[in-house]
């Protein structure tokens, strides 16, 4: 029997038919998506493991319908950081579904501080001391966003299913990913990542960066 592990995921959007289109998910039917995502979780996460879901577990479902899907996930200890589409999971009839966490959850494990939230942050607690930021919400597709973070020394990761082959990501995988990455001591706002892809914003940030460099040369 292996040692219990910690896993992260986000934005499963169980029950949300429109997510098949706007996130280009590879299923034609919402029930197929629901059960495939549950199978993927159960294939990775053992009942004794811990799973952090960083928001948007379901959408367009009643809390009871979402609860029935939750019961199909074998993991006993699932933490939920609420997203913008989540139900009130503190209701007595479903209170055993999740360990409901605050909007920003900080975990210290394996010598690392992990700052978790549904929404991504440009700057987070202890960023300059090597802390990680794990989030969801943005539905980045494929590895491009997470790879761009890594290339800039940002220990920030979108745990959403759309960015991770529709599977959870383990703490061990993130250790491997971030091992040896030189992070910035602090981030000045002109150097923040342009996550919009807007050419005008790129030009604006480039201009501000030149201003900062000019001031530092004086």
Residues covered by each model-derived region:
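Core catalytic region of metal-dependent phosphoesterases/phosphodiesterases
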Residues: 7-9, 14-106
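Short, Lys/Arg-enriched N-terminal segments with co-localized hydrophobic residues
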Residues: 1-4
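Conserved beta-sheet core of the metallophosphoesterase superfamily
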Residues: 95-197, 202
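N-terminal pre-catalytic "stem/leader" segment of glycosyltransferase-like enzymes
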Residues: 16-21, 190-200, 212-218
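Residue-identity detector for threonine
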Residues: 9-12, 62, 176, 196, ...
């Amino acid at each position: 029997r292996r040692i219990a592990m910690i896993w992260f995921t986000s934005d499963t959007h169980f029950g949300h038919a429109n997510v098949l289109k706007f996130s280009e998910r590879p299923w034609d039917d919402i029930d197929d998506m629901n059960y495939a995502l549950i199978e993927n979780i159960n294939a990775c996460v053992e009942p004794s493991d811990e799973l952090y879901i960083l928001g948007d577990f379901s959408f367009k479902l009643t809390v009871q319908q979402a609860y029935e899907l939750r019961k199909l996930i074998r993991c006993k200890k699932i933490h939920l950081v609420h997203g913008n589409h989540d139900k009130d999971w503190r209701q007595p009839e479903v209170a055993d579904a999740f360990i409901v966490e605050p909007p920003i959850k900080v975990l210290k494990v394996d010598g690392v501080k992990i700052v978790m939230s549904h929404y991504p942050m440009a700057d987070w607690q202890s960023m300059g001391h090597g802390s990680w930021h794990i989030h969801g919400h943005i539905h980045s597709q494929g590895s491009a966003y997470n790879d761009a973070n890594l290339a800039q020394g940002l220990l920030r990761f979108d745990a959403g299913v759309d960015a991770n082959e529709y599977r959870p990501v383990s703490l061990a995988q993130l250790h491997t990913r971030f091992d040896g990455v030189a992070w910035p001591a602090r981030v000045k706002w002109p150097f923040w990542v342009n996550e919009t892809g807007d050419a005008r914003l790129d030009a604006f940030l480039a201009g501000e960066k030149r201003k900062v460099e000019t001031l530092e040369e004086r």
